[in-house]
Amino acid sequence: MEELGDRLATLGWVSDLFVGGSVATDDYTPRISDIDLVALVDGPVDTARQSTLMTLHRALDDGIAADLKLGCVYVEDAQLLDLRAVHPTWTHGSLVDRILSGVARAELVRYGYAVLGRSPLDVLPVMSDDDVREAARAELTGYWTWAARRPWLWLDPVIADLGLTSMARGRHTLATGELLTKTQAVECAAGPAWLVDQLRARRRGEHVPSPRVRAALIAWRDARRTVARAQH
């Protein structure tokens, strides 16, 4: 993270670099968790800037950041408060366009810190418990509602695992206004004990597969229930 901050600082158009996600919440598991970063830039990330960022990230991914799953959202400072704006995002070896979700913003405000520049609290508004609830509701009624309508997606073990923990996190946040880490979410997953044990093992980095169809059905049904409740 520090190396990325140093390299971005030399570009002259990146002012801040924030750490969010599992690193900020002290829930990071090497080679399992992603490293979620957010950078602020002084203007649009045009084609030339995108090329620069891709070259920079590929060099890191091939070197010091190999296997670290380092990702970064590049947010134009003028669009920082626009929840619908999409931003160039380096993730898993590619530059794609994504929003900076309300939940990601809540993690930054409540737990995030700066590697470069200002504190997240200096540039992002404070989020109340109700604000965080609405951020969680937006994720459940957005992407996860879309996914719940496509049962075949859940045959992917990655989606099944992510769905179970995301539903647990969403339910907890709607009820309390507080954020839940992925490790904590495993303990709250709506699955039988054998599946929770397997989720726990995978979170520790162990290669413990689950029965593909059974896990998919459990996760999909949980998502259907959870997103339906989030609509009301």
Q: What are these model-derived regions, one by one?
A:
Residues 54-155, 164:
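Conserved NTP/Mg2+-binding pocket subregion across the NTase superfamily
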Residues 114-232:
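Nucleotidyltransferase catalytic cores
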Residues 21-57, 69-73:
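Catalytic metal-binding acidic patch
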Residues 9, 58-61, 228:
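A general structural signal for alpha-helical elements within enzymatic catalytic domains
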Residues 1-18, 48-50, 231-232:
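Helical scaffold of the NTase/Pol beta-like nucleotidyltransferase catalytic core
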Residues 3-4, 52-59, 222:
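Long, highly charged amphipathic alpha-helices
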Residues 24-25, 79, 169-172:
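Short, solvent-exposed loop/turn segments at secondary-structure junctions
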